Amino acid sequence: MVKVQLFFSLLFFFLSFNIKGQKNLQCVSNDSIVMRVVPCVLGTSSDFICVDIFNNSDFRISCGTYYDFQQFQFNKWVDIDFGDMAWEAGIYYINRKRNRVLKCYLNKEKYKYTPGKYRVIKYVTIEKEIYEKRKVVADFILK
């Protein structure tokens, strides 16, 4: 009986150690790439927002000009549909431990903004041995 208890105690110890170790296997932590809107409160008369993307990782990242917007409605995020839209071709690079400010146009001719909470969504690529795509979001308020 003592051997069985010892076996299970050791088994749980090693399993918990392996699970804790696996959490640290990710090369880039979830908060190593951060985006924010500056300033985060704007008037509805604004034509664009400025996003500041911070690359706190150990790898260079890149992103295109494409972005999405969502509005917070009825306690959930709802996509804003701009319909068919062409995007300027281009790639922005952000070196490790650096940041970059980009403009995101609100495209008011395609959507009528009302005061409320919004967020911008961009996709970045982390340029490590195997490229990793990551979604980053930043909230802002239109008054």
Regions found by a protein language model. Give the residues of each.
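Bacterial Sec-dependent N-terminal signal peptides
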Residues: 1-25, 118
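Short, solvent-exposed, Trp/other aromatic-anchored flexible loops in extracytoplasmic proteins
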Residues: 83-117, 123-127
